[in-house]
Amino acid sequence: MVSDFMKGRYNLMKIFVGIDIAKLNHFAAAISSDGEIILEPFKFTNDADGFQLLISKLESFDKNSIIIGLESTAHYGDNLVRYLVTELYQVCVLNPIKTCQMRKNNVRKTKTDKVDTYVIAKTLMMQDNLRFVSFFDLDMMDLKALGRFRQKTIKQRTRLKIQLTTYVDQVFPEIQYFFKSGLHQKAVYALLKEAPSPKEVASMHMTHLANLLKVNSHGHFTKEQAKELRVLAQKSVGANDSAISSQITQTIQQIELLDSQLEKIEAEMTDIMKYNDSVIMTIPGIGYVNGGMILGEIGDIHRFSNPNKLLAFAGLDPSVYQSGNFQAKTTRMSKRGSRVLRYALVNAAWNVVRNNVTFKAYYDAKRAEGRSHYNALGHCAGKLVRVIWKMLTDNVAFNLE
């Protein structure tokens, strides 16, 4: 327990708390700004009881004098960071490169959880211009997680749609001639869930079949077209395989489940974006979801001292090819860095091209040089990165006419 005298003394100086993060148990220690050990390393669990133990150790000191640091390691520290920020502590997430440098300077080449707490605390103490995690940063963490989960969900859905097409080709190949817009629409899913084989479609009552198509296509299909579909079903050469028919029904149910999950994910992203009211939403053609994916991946714009660093982070910078005296004049984008950010930026760039004359002129100029659509779009995405960097850095609205 810290005496009142020592508490008053420590409140006059900064206290640096280093936390070594792990999956189940964390270690923490604290030093003063003159290097004195205030709290010996102690273990606490990665749960509510453990977090309370940490707080109880820090309660003896003035909250405003405490600076808490931890390394950016996977996701194990995310809950602790959220908890501490919510409790209004000053929290700094350190780049492991910084702590690695401090570890190398240690005379004793020892690496344990307890030693690492001091290394992290000393790294905090030696840093200038520390940036603390804010509530905005927590929202960006949420956007990043939601955006990446959205991408995974879309990939899952795409695989299921490919499987569904394969199944339908086997049991009812003629259906593709009737639904010219493709299989993946509400009317087709409604039909195949109820009648996943041509035999079942052919035996459906005409009034019911016509009504099912009409309701699920918002009146697009008529009774005459329903008759055409039934004739196709009667003449189908597809396999009458109950196992495949069952897979068709279940695959559609899985696709629809993923559709509903995507709606919820995008609604959450939209709510976060509306609350934060970022200047990125002033860019014509960028919506809440796409804007949210970009912001979530970028996080703190001040991590990037210039737009070229943001370009490299997105993998939109040109790769360099040089051998001896030869250096390639044209190279492809490096495609390193955040794949999700690169996808979001290229997608956003196409929307901006279609909604802004400056970007449209830039795209047309690249096409006039003989570049392909995707090559020109990559250049537009690079231009968009520079615009976004400037907007977020200076917090100014889009102003390119």
Predicted regions, residues:
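A detector of single, family-specific signature residues
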Residues: 1-401
